[in-house]
Amino acid sequence: MKRFDRTAAGVVFALAAALGPRGAEARDVTIELMNAQGQPIGHATIAPESGGVGLRVDVTGLAPGSHGIHFHEVGKCEPPSFASAGGHFNPDGKHHGLDNPAGPHAGDFPNLVVGPDGSAHASFVSPRVTLATDGHGLFRSGGTSLVIHADPDDEKTDPAGNSGARIACGVIAR
């Protein structure tokens, strides 16, 4: 009986060791978004999805129209300019834009479309990032952030698609 208990415990520990990192990566993570005045305007959720990392955005209080939205390279969001978030997340050193043949940055997304009531509810999937701690991982040392810009992203111009000022930001953290 004791031999069985030790064997069972060994199997459990082996499975936990083998599945542990994947289990940690598989968790949904909520990103609290704030505007340039430091007020909360909504949230985003990242989660593993078939083909990459899913991003679900739910925000209010923005100007109607299209807005650039990107993962940025630093896990800081200091209002009002959010310059502390650094540039776009770009571990491969590519050019900006989904329509750029020399791109895109790992942090690039299609535009976020805000309705006439100032709210946006959108979902995207990025095959260029992971929920790991290195390489293309959003949980790497120094962190990352999600930034919404004032203007539409033209999807081709370096470094940020002419998407204008940073109007909302959220730190990506577990």
Model-identified regions with their sequence ranges:
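Bacterial N-terminal signal peptides that target proteins for export
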Residues: M1-V11
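N-terminal leader/targeting pre-sequences
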Residues: A14-S66, F71-R174
